């Protein structure tokens, strides 16, 4: 798939704030703070500043909607697991995400995991929660450029002590080199055509 047009539409907290079009597919991106959600969105759309990136974890505090090719939405969800945020704010982010995931919108959730880290309890809870809600989801391992092939193989072995998956069922992505970009876009196109 070629992304020719990508526009920020709006930020939302409550369901009443979501875009009104229910017929458009939504690809939502969720993961720990600083896992690279905004960088991945910028990589997929080939727009360096579409989704705001920051070295400071916890910058994405709202649900951000981007309309792609006037056909579907990319949705940037708030990150979870950032310790330096007040408990009340964490609770609010959690409720914002819960409302979105529980909404009856046509969506697929991409769960982003940093390949350098074994999945946290929060990552596992997110995956279990998606399964409990019978949500369609895929895992994307980010920051693959930070490890050599040998280190990556070792790390995947460690990750599999906490998470069961086949390498063919997940995506591997680098925002630095755009490795994995085409595979993710092709998968999204398949979902749109089904």
Curated annotation (Swiss-Prot):
Q: Specify which residues bind GTP according to the UniProt entry for this protein.
A: 31-38, 58-62, 76-79, 142-145, 173-175
Q: Which UniProt keywords apply?
A: Cell cycle, Cell division, GTP-binding, Magnesium, Metal-binding, Nucleotide-binding, Septation
Which biological process, per GO, is one annotated for this protein?
division septum assembly
Per UniProt, residues of the EngB-type G domain are: 23-194
Q: Record's InterPro entries?
A: G_ENGB_dom, GTP-bd, GTP-bd_ribosome_bio_YsxC, P-loop_NTPase
One Pfam family in the UniProt entry: MMR_HSR1
Gene Ontology cellular-component annotations: cytosol
Has UniProt tagged this entry with the keyword Transcription regulation? no
Amino acids binding Mg(2+): 38, 60
User: What are the GO MF terms of this UniProt record?
Assistant: GTP binding; metal ion binding
SUPFAM superfamilies in the record: P-loop containing nucleoside triphosphate hydrolases
Q: Which cofactor does it need?
A: Mg(2+)
Family, according to the entry, reads as follows: Belongs to the TRAFAC class TrmE-Era-EngA-EngB-Septin-like GTPase superfamily. EngB GTPase family.
Q: What does this protein do?
A: Necessary for normal cell division and for the maintenance of normal septation.
Q: What is this protein called?
A: Probable GTP-binding protein EngB
Organism encoding this protein: Fusobacterium nucleatum subsp. nucleatum (strain ATCC 25586 / DSM 15643 / BCRC 10681 / CIP 101130 / JCM 8532 / KCTC 2640 / LMG 13131 / VPI 4355)
Q: Which gene encodes it?
A: engB
């Amino acid at each position: 798939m070629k992304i020719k047009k990508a526009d920020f539409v709006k930020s939302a907290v409550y369901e009443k704030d979501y875009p009104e079009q229910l017929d458009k597919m939504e690809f939502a991106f969720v993961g720990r703070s600083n896992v690279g959600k905004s960088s991945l969105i910028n990589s997929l759309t080939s727009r360096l500043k579409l989704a705001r990136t920051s070295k400071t974890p916890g910058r994405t505090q709202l649900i951000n909607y981007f309309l792609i090719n006037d056909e579907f939405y990319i949705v940037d969800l708030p990150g979870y697991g950032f310790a330096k945020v007040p408990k009340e704010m964490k609770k609010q982010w959690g409720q914002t995400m819960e409302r979105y995931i529980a909404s009856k919108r046509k969506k697929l959730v991409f769960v982003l995991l940093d390949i350098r880290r074994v999945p946290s309890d929060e990552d596992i809870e997110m995956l279990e929660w998606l399964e409990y809600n019978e949500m369609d989801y895929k895992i994307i391992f980010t920051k693959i450029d930070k490890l050599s092939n040998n280190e990556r193989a070792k790390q995947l072995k460690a990750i599999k002590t906490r998470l069961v998956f086949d390498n063919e069922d997940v995506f591997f992505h680098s925002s630095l080199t755009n490795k994995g970009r085409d595979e993710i876009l092709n998968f999204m196109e398949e979902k749109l055509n089904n």
